């Protein structure tokens, strides 16, 4: 099989586009075929190099490597449509010379006005074929005189049948398709011409895309026939919708692949989750690695019913992948997050060792990689005590707890979690306090928060020297607040 993903670089990679790329990639990998990336950048006013780069980075992050396309090359270079305009012009001229296309001299403003009126009257806004009736001789004279024109495809009579691999047979009445534009007045190709010429040239034999393209398919099949080319197999994937049943968009929350990367989702979880947006292995299996997906994916189990985007399920699934990681793997995934947030520098490799030790303490509390930040930040930067936690450092009782904790910890020969726990429990007993009440001021002094990973292990990770510094600083905070209150009075 030869399959392609052909995004328009006018913005971010939408999760719907990523799902389409994934299904094409899985089919290529499961069949030993080729996955081609083609950039459809004919919208010159909106396409940007930055968007192209971002789309490629998102695909690479997801692990959807391409066999032909930008950065890797191939036999059908270039893989950007702006570098292929000569092919489109040649195809349009060939159709024109064969009488399968014609020149349209109608002013765009006039066509737009007719389109608006048709919509107002609830009619299909098709071109009225006025220029179709102009003789070739007259059209040639008007072109030679410099009159601007577009090229339109001459739709034949009859019906067009699509044998969709997911939806079965779909029949279109050609009379309702309309003579559509192939080349605009400015010499740029329209989507339908460019995509067909490219798919023919790149020998694409399976077109797998979203069902929003169904209306384009009869136009393209007729164009394949006019160009005397083999028609590929078509499969139109079900739409992805929000919980309100409407097409997934920004109003439903984050929809850009890059945003999920920033939020700490794993590519493995994203691929697993997106694979299930329309396809299933059976009625029960949910967690599947990439190898399982490749071995089992086929269009036979892709349904036509809309797939619902369930962010809660994605978050749960991401948590399952985090739970399955080794300590080293989790540390290697969290480390770049710390670098990105400025908590550590990239060359501070000891951070990985610290994170590896912290992994067992934080893993069960994590659903996303970013969840690690509030739990481990105290290990890499001086703490800033949360406003709602300050009260646990204030007052004579809390100050006594912190002082006694410092004394007990300072006496330890081995600064390990088990010994730390024994020392702090001894402190609580000496002060006739329940352990929970005695431990909270220490927790806030060490981590800056009432909520943290297990206290004794956290203190061990922080180390004796920094622990004593934190406890001393907690005593200073109380002194500063007392002095401040005195000045105000």
What are these regions (language model features)?
Residues 94, 102-103, 107-236, 241-248, ...:
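Active-site cores that bind ATP or allylic diphosphates and position pyrophosphate for catalysis
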Residues 57-60, 93, 225, 258, ...:
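Generic alpha-helical structural context detector
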Residues 44, 228-233, 237-385, 447-484, ...:
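Catalytic adenosine-cofactor/nucleotide-binding cores of aminoacyl-tRNA synthetases and other
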Residues 3-9, 37-41, 202-207, 255, ...:
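Glycine- and acidic
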Residues 331, 393-446, 450-451:
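C-terminal accessory/binding modules appended to enzymatic or scaffolding proteins
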Residues 1-120, 216-229:
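N-terminal Rossmann-like or analogous alpha/beta NTP/dinucleotide-binding catalytic cores
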Residues 24, 55, 95, 99, ...:
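Residue-level signal for inorganic ion chemistry
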């Amino acid at each position: 099989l030869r399959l392609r993903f052909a995004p328009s670089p006018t913005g971010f990679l939408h999760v719907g586009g990523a799902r389409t790329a994934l299904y094409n990639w899985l089919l290529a990998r499961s069949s030993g075929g080729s996955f081609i990336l083609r950039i459809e950048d004919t919208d010159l006013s909106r396409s940007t190099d930055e968007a192209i780069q971002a789309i490629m980075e998102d695909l690479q992050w997801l692990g959807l490597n391409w066999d032909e396309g930008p950065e890797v090359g191939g036999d059908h270079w270039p893989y950007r449509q702006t570098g292929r305009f000569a092919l489109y012009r040649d195809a349009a001229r060939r159709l024109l010379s064969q009488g399968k296309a014609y020149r349209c001299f109608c002013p765009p403003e006039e066509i737009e006005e007719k389109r608006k009126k048709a919509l107002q009257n609830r009619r299909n806004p098709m071109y009225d074929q006025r220029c179709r009736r102009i003789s070739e001789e007259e059209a040639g004279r008007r072109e030679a005189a410099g009159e601007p024109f577009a090229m339109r495809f001459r739709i034949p009579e009859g019906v067009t049948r699509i044998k969709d691999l997911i939806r079965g047979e779909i029949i279109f009445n050609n009379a309702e398709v309309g003579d559509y534009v192939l080349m605009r007045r400015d010499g740029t190709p329209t989507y339908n011409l460019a995509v067909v010429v490219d798919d023919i040239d790149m020998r694409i034999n399976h077109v797998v895309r979203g069902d929003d393209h169904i209306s384009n398919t009869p136009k393209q099949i007729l164009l394949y026939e006019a160009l005397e080319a083999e028609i590929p197999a078509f499969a139109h994937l079900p739409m992805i919708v929000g919980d309100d049943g409407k097409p997934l968009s920004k109003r439903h929350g984050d929809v850009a692949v890059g945003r999920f990367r920033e939020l700490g989702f794993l590519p493995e979880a994203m691929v697993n989750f997106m694979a299930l947006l329309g396809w299933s292995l059976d009625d029960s299996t949910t967690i599947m690695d990439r190898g399982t997906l490749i071995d089992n994916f086929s269009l036979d189990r892709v349904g036509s019913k809309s797939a619902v985007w369930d962010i809660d399920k994605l978050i749960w699934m991401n948590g399952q992948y985090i739970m399955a990681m080794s300590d080293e793997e989790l540390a290697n995934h969290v480390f770049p997050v710390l670098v990105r947030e400025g908590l550590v520098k990239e060359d501070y490799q000891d951070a990985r060792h610290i994170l590896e030790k912290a992994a067992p303490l934080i893993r069960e509390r994590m659903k996303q990689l970013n969840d690690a930040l509030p739990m481990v930040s105290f290990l890499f930067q001086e703490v800033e005590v949360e406003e709602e936690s300050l009260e646990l450092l204030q007052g004579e009782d809390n100050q006594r707890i912190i002082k006694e904790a410092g004394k007990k910890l300072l006496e330890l020969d081995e600064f390990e979690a088990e010994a730390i726990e024994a020392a702090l429990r001894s402190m609580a007993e000496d002060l006739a306090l329940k352990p929970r009440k005695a431990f909270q001021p220490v927790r806030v002094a060490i981590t800056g928060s009432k909520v943290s990973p297990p206290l004794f292990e956290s203190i061990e990770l922080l180390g004796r020297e920094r622990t004593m510094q934190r406890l001393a600083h907690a005593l200073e905070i109380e002194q500063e607040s007392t002095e401040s209150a005195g000045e105000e009075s």
